Amino acid sequence: MVDPQFASNFYFDQRLNIDAVKLLPGEYFVTTREMVLSTVLGSCVSACIYDQQSRIGGMNHFMLPSSENSSGFPIECARFGGYAMGILIRELLKNGARKQNLVAKVFGGGNVQPAMVTSAIGSQNARFVKKYLAEYEIPILAGDLEGFYPRKLHFFPKSGRVLLKKLHVSHNDTIAKREKHYSRLLLSTVKPGI
């Protein structure tokens, strides 16, 4: 059975001339193929983790650091960093990566919604991913975290190469609308006590 949190939005990126997968919040993807993994990040974070020797890599896209249900058990959903990081690493290892060869590049965690500045979700996500990778002794080779801008990210898992574009939004509220939509979706799908 295919994990429903495994990204499935495949397309051909004509500008980059390569097969691609677009990751939405709460998704992850692992591959050995020559392709690009892409996403757009606001307050969310993506960890791009790859094995430099076996050339296998993957990426996740999570919305919040972690969550627990009313019984104190972690919620197994890739929208939350704890689960998203764990499943990405497990899938990399299951597909042939070796723990000692894993390295990471991390992006996102912007505080892009004025209303969210007080809760600083982006900063919480950024701190979480750095702490998680340090605890698992996976070095961070590069990253672009926090700030006030959304980012468009392209990750080439076989080589570890990243293309990053900061989206300087002036009158376009698309990212903010998406962030609000995903936040509402998150609240409606995670029920207390589950």
UniProtKB/Swiss-Prot annotation:
One of the protein's GO biological processes: chemotaxis
Gene3D superfamilies given in the database record: 3.30.1330.200
Keyword Hydrolase: yes
The protein's Enzyme Commission number: 3.5.1.44
Residues annotated as transmembrane: none
Reaction equations catalysed: L-glutaminyl-[protein] + H2O = L-glutamyl-[protein] + NH4(+)
Matches recorded under Pfam families: CheD
GO molecular function: protein-glutamine glutaminase activity
Keywords noted in UniProt: Chemotaxis, Hydrolase
Purpose: Probably deamidates glutamine residues to glutamate on methyl-accepting chemotaxis receptors (MCPs), playing an important role in chemotaxis.
The family this protein is said to belong to: Belongs to the CheD family.
Protein name (Swiss-Prot/TrEMBL): Probable chemoreceptor glutamine deamidase CheD
Organism of this sequence: Nitrosomonas eutropha (strain DSM 101675 / C91 / Nm57)
Gene this chain is encoded by: cheD
